[in-house]
């Protein structure tokens, strides 16, 4: 994916999410690695794709290793948004072995999860054949919505609403309580705050 077309990912938000993930996994310390791996041992390794995928999550993985230990060297061997085949190299890491072991699972979690979303999205876009846009929903992992929606864009999809606050989408429960689809649409248009030009959309089950 050309740099000019790469989706934007808020660096402040990304840093916050990575810190939260590391706190969740490491807590006060990696007890096993501290007790088992010699302090002076150095290591290196290469992350490789285990199957065909669209790569997403490199920025998160890089920050994981940097936060765990600034001495770790992370070198990207593939581009964010690139199609990779099984066995293709993603990145190379070198430095203190303890730190590599402590950081690897969190980094892999970001890469695997976001690449999975990007790959599935890219496959959906290909099947659509340009006849329609492929958009996401609010059915996201709590706390990871922004990152997951970023992965959708990496895969060539489009974002729909970020939350309940930035779009009007009338679903079955809404129009049933409003007295019908027409009544719900009219009410939504009438009650738009200060005439805000938000599109009013209705969820459908058939076309």
PLM feature spans:
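Acidic/glycine-rich phosphate/pyrophosphate-binding loops and surrounding catalytic core
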Residues: 2-205
